[in-house]
Amino acid sequence: MALTAKVKDELARLPVTKTCCRKAEVAATLRFAGGLHLVGGRIVVEAELDTGAAARRLRTALAELYGQHAELAVIAPGGLHRGNRYVVRVSRDGETLAKQTGLLDGRGRPVRGLPSQIVSGGVCDAAAAWRGAFLAHGSLTEPGRGCTLEVSCPGPESALALVGAARRLGVQAKSREVRGVERVVVRDGDAIGVLLTRLGAHDSVLAWEEYRVRREVRATANRLANFDDANVRRSARAAVTAAAKVKRALEILGDSVPEHLAAAGTLRMVHPQVSLEELGALADPPLTKDAIAGRIRRLIAMADRRADELGIPGTEAALVGELP
């Protein structure tokens, strides 16, 4: 199950007993998932949700808190929606319900943000509002290049209200407009974990953290692999460079090169790709990494001094065209 579906399923089954919290959740769900419609001169309250569990939760809450019998309709997949959509609709006494849930104020005017009792309420009300908003239009991406928990909002006022509710929960959220839609976004991985915990999605938090850890382990392994590859490439380039310079050094020095330096240089030319440690092991008798490297350095330095005396190109001349 995708993370978004997992979170919504868990939140839709979360038992909540406090009336104020249940009302805050219902108000937010209606605000973010639906709206008001005028049908035959009557106000109809409607909410469209993407999970059956969330729709049934809303329908039950409307009956228990407000005594409203809501219709539940299922819309088959089509257009941009790959799965079923669930519409919860209250046609009878819709205006009364709209006022009770804060969709309309006392004078019957639309409320653009969240009801004042949520905005000025406690932490539990803020968490309930976020729970309703996420059930309505929330999404959670799996940790990857960027972690994102996002809620699409019906307008800037509701987005700002949701940002304020997040602040009361100790979470930094930002509001932004994307392709004409207001969205509230939480990007920090730790903040997402805190928010999910506040909403009551404890099992989902564990799954989220497991995804994060797995992603970080993979990223660390990739960094180490890239680091190792880079080291191998650097070592190989250095070995090829040394082999080319050694060949030129032996040409410059001819028979005057000391035997032990000539032996070290010959080993490097014969085995241009091996590491210094492996090269030392091939010597007779075996040499340490530092010892074989020192002999090769002295051979090249001796050849460069001799080239200066003779006025001819030194060992660097051997590198032209040798390396990419």
UniProtKB/Swiss-Prot annotation:
A GO BP annotation: cell division
Question: What GO molecular function annotations does the UniProt record carry, in alphabetical order?
Answer: DNA binding
Give the matching InterPro entries: Homing_endonucl (IPR027434), Sporu_reg_WhiA_N_dom (IPR018478), Sporulation_regulator_WhiA (IPR003802), Sporulation_regulator_WhiA_C (IPR023054), WhiA_LAGLIDADG_dom (IPR039518)
The alphabetized UniProt keywords are:
Cell cycle, Cell division, DNA-binding
Q: Which residues bind DNA?
A: 275-308
User: Which NCBIfam families does the UniProt record give?
Assistant: DNA_bind_WhiA
**Protein family:** Belongs to the WhiA family.
Q: What does this protein do?
A: Involved in cell division and chromosome segregation.
Give the protein's recorded name. Answer: Probable cell division protein WhiA
Q: Look up and give the organism this protein is from.
A: Acidothermus cellulolyticus (strain ATCC 43068 / DSM 8971 / 11B)
